[in-house]
């Protein structure tokens, strides 16, 4: 087992699925299907689910829809499964309200994204996250850094200061580089649980201290991802690497265009009628859909 992986806490388990939000033919949230999908994902190996994150199309869900969806998923999977709510906003007041509401609904944690568009300095980011943490002190927080979408990045030194808040326990690293994990460990030590925000970087990030992943691909290959993680933790590096290489075509196919467009198409192709994304996102175009179908078919044969 990797000593780094062994020494770091895993507050939400190791394999978390960033769950899509199903829509019906009228574009309304399909709560019944969401419950069935949540149970399926857990059966396929997910330790926990992230509801209303990037993959869940949080920017186009109303707060009411988000609270309803969280409640349905919480009830569907029962108390033994970790459920995190995406509660981030570029308004600190909105993020506080969403986070306290998530705690009231029964979330096990909150995924709180770096404020987007308004590009606050590090001092503003620290004040933002500190205010959220203090408003819901009993709810564990996962800070979420994805500069490609937000326009600014949360520095490891800022994260280290935020760990003065006892409920700042984890970090979703989605900057696209393993160095982010290294810098976080150097600044924060092993008490911060760092999760890869990129399926394709899961194994490389675990090798430098990440504890798991917030996954998109686990909608389709949860058992294989769980097997890869377990192989790595059990010292079976060659086996873990074989899973990593086997799954690369799917990882790439799921990000051929903006997430969650491809994964929703893949679920449709796999028999889950989760519907198209809401505007301004569009369904996957036919050429990409055919290529994705071929990738899924090839994966089934391995």
UniProtKB/Swiss-Prot annotation:
InterPro entries: Aldolase_TIM, DapA, DapA-like, Schiff_base-form_aldolases_AS, Schiff_base-form_aldolases_CS
Highest taxon of the lineage: Bacteria
Gene3D superfamilies: Aldolase class I
Function: Catalyzes the condensation of (S)-aspartate-beta-semialdehyde [(S)-ASA] and pyruvate to 4-hydroxy-tetrahydrodipicolinate (HTPA).
Homology family: Belongs to the DapA family.
Subcellular location: Cytoplasm
Pathway the protein acts in: Amino-acid biosynthesis; L-lysine biosynthesis via DAP pathway; (S)-tetrahydrodipicolinate from L-aspartate: step 3/4
One Gene Ontology cellular component annotation held by this UniProt entry: cytosol
GO biological process terms, semicolon-separated: diaminopimelate biosynthetic process; lysine biosynthetic process via diaminopimelate
Chief place where the protein resides: cytoplasm
CDD domains linked: DHDPS
Site (Part of a proton relay during catalysis): 54, 117
Protein name: 4-hydroxy-tetrahydrodipicolinate synthase
Designated gene of the protein: dapA
Catalysed reactions, as listed in the record: L-aspartate 4-semialdehyde + pyruvate = (2S,4S)-4-hydroxy-2,3,4,5-tetrahydrodipicolinate + H2O + H(+)
Binding site for pyruvate: 55, 214
Annotated EC: 4.3.3.7
Subunit note: Homotetramer; dimer of dimers.
Lineage of the organism: Bacteria, Bacillati, Cyanobacteriota, Cyanophyceae, Synechococcales
Active-site residues, record numbering mapped to chain: 144, 172
Disulphide connectivity of cysteines: none
One Pfam family matching this protein: DHDPS
SUPFAM superfamilies tied to this protein: Aldolase
